[in-house]
């Protein structure tokens, strides 16, 4: 588990490095599917003092099996997503400014250009709001459930992120570092969309053929972007 702890530690340290978190407002996890264990950031521990050995290991029920700290308060959300989507290898949650602004506005982040289309196949959706009963009940678990409800049967790696209404963004990927990469992109395209709509409030979505081209050349079966 030490290798995964180091990976999750480094991915968590990338959050302040890329300007995605203030104070302790974020967390990253990864999963060992063979062993059914998840490694996640400890709750409320400052990034400046955090070490790889501080990462917490939990089983799929959320029970701590290794670590001195309590796991992130969002652990139940991470676990629910891992249970539903076998393709996920890493998950990140932040309160990055622009993506969170779209969440607070209750709006999907619109696909307006090729930067967005390189990573997200369509709009980045916004969930519905949670009911009072859902919040007062198993809040973090229900946050995971509303994300799943919103995504439906979509392939999560084609839409590797979402904004939870009145809360903030969650992103995911093949591993912890890929999830952080997608979270960084989400924040950037959220900012671009806000600026672009400010310049032209009537701005429409990217042309579907251009979106298809950009997404498929990076992620499709005949992808040719980058090196093999």
From Swiss-Prot:
Its cofactor is Zn(2+). One of its GO terms (biological process) is L-ascorbic acid catabolic process. Binds 1 zinc ion per subunit. Gene3D superfamilies: Class II aldolase/adducin N-terminal domain. GO terms for cellular component: cytosol. Substrate binds at residues 26-27, 43-44, 72-73. It holds the Pfam family Aldolase_II. SMART domains: Aldolase_II. Keywords: Carbohydrate metabolism, Isomerase, Metal-binding, Zinc. Its EC number is 5.1.3.4. The active site is at residues 118, 225. Zn(2+) binds at residues 74, 93, 95, 167. It is an enzyme of class 5 (isomerase). Pathway: Cofactor degradation; L-ascorbate degradation; D-xylulose 5-phosphate from L-ascorbate: step 4/4. GO terms for molecular function: aldehyde-lyase activity; L-ribulose-phosphate 4-epimerase activity; zinc ion binding. Induction: Induced by L-ascorbate. Repressed by UlaR. It catalyses: L-ribulose 5-phosphate = D-xylulose 5-phosphate. Catalyzes the isomerization of L-ribulose 5-phosphate to D-xylulose 5-phosphate. Is involved in the anaerobic L-ascorbate utilization. NCBIfam families: PRK08193.1, PRK12348.1. Belongs to the aldolase class II family. AraD/FucA subfamily. HAMAP family: UlaF (MF_01952). This is L-ribulose-5-phosphate 4-epimerase UlaF.
């Amino acid at each position: 588990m030490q290798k995964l702890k180091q990976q999750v530690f480094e991915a968590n340290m990338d959050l302040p490095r890329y300007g995605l978190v203030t104070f302790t407002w974020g967390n990253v996890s990864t999963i060992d599917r063979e062993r059914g264990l998840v490694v996640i950031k400890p709750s409320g521990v400052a990034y400046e003092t955090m070490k790889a050995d501080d990462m917490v290991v939990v089983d799929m029920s959320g029970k701590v099996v290794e670590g001195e700290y309590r796991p992130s308060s969002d652990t139940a959300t991470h676990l629910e997503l891992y249970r539903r989507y076998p393709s996920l290898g890493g998950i990140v949650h932040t309160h990055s400014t622009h993506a969170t602004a779209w969440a607070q506005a209750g709006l999907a982040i619109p696909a307006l250009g090729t930067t967005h289309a390189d990573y997200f196949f369509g709009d980045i959706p916004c969930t519905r709001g949670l009911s009072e009963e859902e919040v007062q009940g198993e809040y973090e678990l229900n946050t995971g459930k509303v994300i799943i409800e919103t995504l439906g049967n979509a392939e999560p790696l084609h839409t590797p992120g979402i904004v939870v209404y009145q809360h903030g963004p969650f992103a995911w990927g093949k591993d912890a570092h890929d999830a952080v990469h997608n979270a960084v992109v989400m924040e950037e395209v959220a900012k671009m969309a806000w600026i672009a709509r400010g310049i032209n409030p009537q701005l429409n979505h990217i042309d579907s053929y251009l979106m298809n081209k950009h997404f498929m050349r990076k992620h499709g079966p005949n992808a040719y972007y980058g090196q093999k």
